[in-house]
Amino acid sequence: RIVFIKINPEIAIAEIDKKTKQKKYNWNIEIKNYLSDLGYIKLKDNLNFEAKFPKYNGILHLKKFDLKTLDKNTRNKINKAKNKGLNFEKASFNELPILYEFIKRKKEKSLTYYQEYFKVFDRTAIDLFLVSLDTAEFLNNAKKLYDEELKKNSELVANLNKMKNEKKLNLKMNSDQKLLNYKNYLLEAQNKIKKSEKIYIGGALVLKYKNRINIIISGYDQNYKRFNPNYLLHYEIFNYYKKNYAFADMNGITGDFKKENPYYGLNKFKLGFKPKIYEFIGEYDLPIFPFLYKWNLKNGKLAKRLNRKNLKKTVLN
């Protein structure tokens, strides 16, 4: 039995100024009243990711996309990634297990889920991209990091011998840990070269529809975060599609732009590509059987089925 219908219309009600973060509302906001008159129940404003779908999003105009227009920090990270030997490549269905290793902790979905998801769409409608690390460049980088830290460590040992204190001891211990990490990187790089293995460190699934693309999900190996794979991945994706598509959907941001926001890093990353920021009308439920809807909501059954722990709290009375 259908208890209710959920909608999440792609109707932008405001554009948000990139600098001031002030909202400029348009006439679409009146649609809220029409929906209410029709019996739709508005869910509480989704400032972060409390609801099933994000209420705020960045839309990138691909025709205007250029490295020079990006945030300075974003440009620097992209250029560093290029200099560190990262490679961007289009992959096939058979490489989905590689991507899955980078995204399996983001959502409680199995590899089979993504494989079936991939098969649902026409082959021309969905793409898989991967970022790999050149093993020779990785070896050079690992050796450089190790040698630099070894030099620092020797200096810390000399200073510690002259005068011991807690601060110097902590610095030495931190340096020891870094040395161990860099040594492991070095050994890993040497083993990869011996086995002629490619090191994949990031990837994304992209859906194409009409004049736009949507990055469905992306991820990267945290062990290689210093190589900035996520920055290069998104930059190359936008470049890849800019000739044939007009817009790129950034797949959601939060409406809280304060540094204290736990999602501040995510916002900063996505907004560094200079998309236009929009607030959308949000989610609405249309109860078909109001009594059953309220009963299921009160008992938490809707939250369980929709996998939303705080659903009961997000509905306005």
What would you call each of these model-derived segments?
Residues 18-29, 35-65, 247-317:
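Active-site/acyl-donor-binding loops of N-acyltransferases
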Residues 2-18, 241-254:
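Conserved GNAT acetyl-CoA-binding A-motif
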Residues 26, 38-225:
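A conserved beta-strand-loop-helix scaffold within acyl/acetyltransferase catalytic domains
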Residues 219-228, 254-261:
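Short, contiguous acidic/charged loop-to-helix segments that flank catalytic cores in large enzymes
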Residues 77, 237, 266:
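Aromatic/hydrophobic pocket-lining residues that form π-stacking "cages" and hydrophobic walls in ligand
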Residues 1, 225-239:
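Conserved acetyl-CoA-binding loop-helix of GNAT-fold acetyltransferases
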Residues 14, 137-138, 257:
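Flexible, glycine-rich phosphate/dinucleotide-binding loops
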